[in-house]
Amino acid sequence: DRYEEKLYTLGIHIRPNTTIGGALTVDDLFRDGYETIFMGTGAWRAKSLGIHGETLGNCHYAVNYLQNPDVYRLGDRVAVIGSGNSAMDVARTAIRKGSRYVTIYARRNGISASERELEYALMDGCEIQYAKGIHSVTPEGPMLYDRIFDEDQNLISEGAPYLVPADSTVIAASQAAKDKIVRTTTGITLNKKGLVIVDENGMTERPGVFSAGDVVQGPWTVVHAVRDAKHVAEAMIRYMEQNNSKS
């Protein structure tokens, strides 16, 4: 497309079907003369919630479903666990693919998705319920419980689990960084959410390796990811200029 042609015009090489962390590593890139490396893999690895029933055939992860929704048969009634943009994407996609009753369950009295994404989901016919936690998944649907908050939105108590009938449960509550590049690169560390830790300039604890977007912040909007990437790109230029001035 025109963006790809623009990149080639600028002298940028594109190497398709190449994974960093397999046959090639970050160390290999530095060995061959790269001065800085940007990691923008996104948060495209499902992260388990550690609840009973996640292995059942009627339980799916949002990141897997969104990659190829046509191979899934979710049924008429779908429960979507989570309140981020990926949860909205799952809900809207399920409606478009034929599911009739799609409900999004948020853990708090609010959402982490953008207001626009929520508006689109509601317009498409999705329902949203707030202050719901997930206890487990059964063949008949998820076991949820009510979460009670005070006026300052501090959690006060949680109710007993109850069944919400659903043909399928899609977990869109947690995603983490692809771990292959992390496992094979010293100095890249993750926080407890599985996201890459960076400083204010987007540099990881490995000098010269930078990162931004979903892999750092978690699933969010393209606008935010692009904004962060521009900031980090400028920091990478400064980093290289400073290193070259010392040599």
Residue spans for each PLM region:
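Phosphate-coordination loops involved in phosphoryl transfer and adenosine-cofactor binding
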Residues: 17, 74-78, 131, 206
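Feature captures the FAD/FMN-dependent oxidoreductase FAD-binding
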Residues: 2-52, 135-142, 168-170, 175-181
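Cofactor-binding loop segments of dinucleotide-utilizing enzymes, especially the Rossmann-like FAD-
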Residues: 83, 106-109, 214
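A conserved FAD-binding loop/helix module that cradles the flavin
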Residues: 90, 212-243
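Rossmann-like dinucleotide-binding cores of NAD(P)H-dependent redox enzymes
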Residues: 1-10, 91-135, 243-247
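Rossmann-like NAD(P)H-binding beta-loop-alpha module
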Residues: 73-99
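General small-molecule cofactor/ligand-binding pocket signal
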Residues: 13-17, 60, 127-129, 210
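FAD-site-proximal beta/loop scaffold in flavoenzymes
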Residues: 55-75, 157, 165-219
